[in-house]
Amino acid sequence: DAFMVGEKLLGYDINTTDKTQLEAVKDKLIAQKPLVQAYVIDQVRDKMIGGEAALAVIYSGEMLYVQKEVKASGANFDLKYVIPKEGSNVWIDSWVIPKNARHKENAEKWIDFMCRADIAKENFEYITYPTPNKAAFELLDPELQNNKALFPDDADLAKCEVFQYLGEEGDALYDELWKEVKAQ
């Protein structure tokens, strides 16, 4: 995800494998390292909850969790989630059943259960990540339904891209460049 931030800042596709572009992104990431307190999501989340950091790159569901924790702690600061004007990434968690699954019927029943509106709403409340289930969405409080961090509008989504699998060679390139960023 760190590379995505630099790619969007520089106007590159988040799935680029262009070495010149990625070197430029790497240089940006190295230049901003003195400002970074954490890259790992759990550390980022904890620093935001503790008021130690003023800015973070964080998933929308994590931000809802952080906002709830800050409010529950009685802290005297508010946190706002924004999608940068350059855009961000869009991601989707999915449930899949392998074609050779031994208990395919049970897996289908579990997915059907999780897709029930009431259960999807409960799952959303527990994991704090947005639900794509329209019936569950209708059960949410209007404050949550109107939370653009969870449910961005079409204008914000139009600025965002989906990560693609770049193959072993692409993964290796990103891994090598990330090692160089961390080593600095």
Task: Write out the residue ranges for each language-model feature.
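Conserved C-terminal helix/tail region of periplasmic/extracytoplasmic solute-binding proteins
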Residues: D46, D154-Q184
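Short, hydrophobic alpha-helical packing/hinge segments within bilobed ligand-binding/sensory domains
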Residues: V44-R45, A53, A107, A120
